[in-house]
């Protein structure tokens, strides 16, 4: 990247995208200061530490290790310089609510045999699907993800046109794409559930994201010792080595253009006057609440018409004893999950028969719980904007704990020694998340690639955005790349 010596840049928000952008900009020579609303850095990748338990409050899956390796390699580093990784086996366990159970492992020959047991011919279809997924992953990452193509003109390129057949082939939905390979509903669920973590439904997520199966089965699922919070610590440490300064408990309430540079003011009345600003706060919140009306790119109708990724009902729990047979990552899936997706995306309601996720990091890491105890959280995807008052939370808590006992055999109810709930209103309060989304903008057909909000402001020179609302999208790896894209855009404009 070009030399930014003498440029003063303020990054508003210390999520993964902001931490990433700060590193790239500081490496290019800019004086970078980062302001974070909350008491710790990491954004949704916050940590909760209490009574000897340590919880990752947000992301808990370490996927796409190649993205992290690429990020650190840019600075002459490796992930292991900052944290240690363990590859999980099994990757995760699935309990189906009809009593069936399957472990998803890193042995694809074994998985092909398991698929064959469910459906004749599915083993061969699984191998073909993964081969296709790998090709699409390599093409998508090299042509569409690592390269920022946020403008229509960026797609009129020989390399892109050469890769276009992949995009055309995958212009349908994940549901129709997976159904072309597998008829058994359980196999379809296995290949589609990770879409929830991209903020979408199989019925609306582009088939492009079949590449996530390559991520899942081929690249593997890892755990950073200490949790995803250790990755945040690594990004912050790298930033400090590059000269980034960080300030927490510094919520920004105004960003406005001045004749020379910007005014950035916090709720405490502290001001900075940078040359450029990178916003990692919730994009819609920043436009609606932090910028003057004449410096906004989009009106309220634009944001009101967007499809936001699910929120979540979370319970962080410290419990006595172990929680066998739960694995580090466990999914519990109903026989028919369409009603749950309807409750998220079509007719918002608390799901009556939910699909949900359990994370038990103490299965892998003794440091996250006191001796003789287990650390776990349960995550139920729910509609953004849903009312989540105390009464409905308590009622739903009882439903979920009973469901866990019925479908996994693990009854937690008499063993909980610590519990904290987190849901829609908490996402809104802690992260200024629009409609309490847990993730950002959903990856729908109308909100993918250049159809996502741009990382350059079209209304104000010198103002940029990074994170899960812009390209390339949702997830820790994508936000790392988003930080790179945003830094490149700023540098291109200054050079």
Curated annotation (Swiss-Prot):
Pathway: Carotenoid biosynthesis. InterPro entries: Amino_oxidase, Carotenoid/retinoid_OxRdtase, FAD/NAD-bd_sf. Its EC number is 1.3.99.37. Pfam families: Amino_oxidase. Keywords: Carotenoid biosynthesis, Oxidoreductase. Disruption phenotype: Cells lacking this gene accumulate DH-IDR and DH-BABR. One of its GO terms (biological process) is carotenoid biosynthetic process. It comes from the Archaea. GO terms for molecular function: oxidoreductase activity, acting on the CH-CH group of donors. It catalyses: dihydroisopentenyldehydrorhodopin + A = isopentenyldehydrorhodopin + AH2; dihydrobisanhydrobacterioruberin + A = bisanhydrobacterioruberin + AH2. Involved in the biosynthesis of the acyclic C50 carotenoid bacterioruberin (BR). Belongs to the carotenoid/retinoid oxidoreductase family. This is Carotenoid 3,4-desaturase. It comes from Haloarcula japonica (strain ATCC 49778 / DSM 6131 / JCM 7785 / NBRC 101032 / NCIMB 13157 / TR-1).
């Amino acid at each position: 990247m070009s030399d930014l010596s003498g440029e003063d840049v303020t990054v508003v928000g210390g999520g993964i995208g902001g931490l990433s952008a700060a590193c790239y900009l500081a490496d290019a020579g800019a004086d970078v200061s980062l302001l974070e609303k909350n008491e710790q850095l990491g954004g949704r990748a916050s940590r909760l530490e209490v009574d000897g338990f340590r919880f990752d409050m947000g992301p808990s899956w370490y996927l796409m290790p190649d993205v992290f390796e690429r990020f650190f390699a840019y600075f002459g580093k490796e992930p292991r310089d900052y944290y240690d990784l363990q590859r999980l086996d099994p990757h995760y366990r699935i309990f189906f609510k009809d009593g069936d159970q399957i472990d998803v492992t890193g042995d694809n020959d074994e998985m092909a045999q398991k698929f064959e047991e469910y459906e004749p011919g599915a083993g061969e279809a699984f191998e073909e699907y993964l081969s296709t997924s790998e090709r699409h992953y390599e093409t998508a990452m090299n042509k569409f993800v690592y390269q920022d193509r946020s403008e229509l003109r960026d797609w009129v390129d020989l390399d892109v046109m050469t890769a276009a057949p992949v995009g055309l082939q995958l212009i349908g939905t994940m549901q129709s794409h997976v159904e072309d390979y597998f008829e058994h509903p359980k196999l379809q669920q296995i290949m589609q559930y990770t879409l929830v973590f991209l903020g979408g439904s199989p019925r609306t997520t582009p088939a492009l994201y079949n590449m996530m199966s390559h991520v899942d089965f081929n690249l593997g699922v890892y755990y950073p010792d200490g949790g995803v919070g250790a990755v945040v610590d690594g990004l912050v440490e790298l930033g400090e080595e590059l000269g980034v300064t960080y300030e927490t408990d510094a919520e920004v309430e105004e960003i406005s253009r001045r004749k020379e540079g910007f005014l950035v003011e916090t709720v405490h009345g502290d001001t900075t006057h940078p040359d450029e600003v990178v916003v990692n706060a919730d994009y819609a919140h920043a436009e609606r609440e932090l910028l003057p009306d004449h410096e906004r790119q989009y009106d309220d109708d634009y944001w009101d018409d967007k499809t936001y990724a699910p929120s979540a009902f979370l319970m962080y729990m410290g419990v006595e004893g172990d929680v066998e047979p739960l694995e580090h990552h466990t999914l519990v899936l109903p026989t028919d999950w369409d009603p749950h997706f309807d409750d998220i995306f079509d007719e918002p309601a608390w799901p009556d028969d939910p699909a949900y996720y359990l994370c038990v990091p103490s299965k892998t890491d003794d440091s996250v719980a006191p001796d003789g105890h287990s650390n776990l959280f349960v995550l139920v995807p729910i509609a953004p904007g849903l009312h989540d008052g105390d009464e409905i939370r308590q009622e739903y808590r009882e439903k979920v704990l009973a469901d866990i006992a019925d479908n996994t055999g693990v009854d937690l109810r008499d063993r909980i020694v610590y519990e904290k709930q987190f849901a829609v209103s908490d996402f809104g309060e802690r992260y200024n998340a629009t409609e309490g989304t847990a993730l950002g903008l959903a990856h729908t057909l109308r909100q993918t690639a250049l159809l996502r909000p741009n990382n350059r402001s079209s209304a104000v020179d010198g103002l940029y955005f990074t994170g899960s609302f812009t390209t390339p999208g949702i997830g820790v790896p994508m936000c790392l790349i988003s930080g790179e894209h945003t830094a490149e855009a700023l540098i291109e404009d200054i050079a």
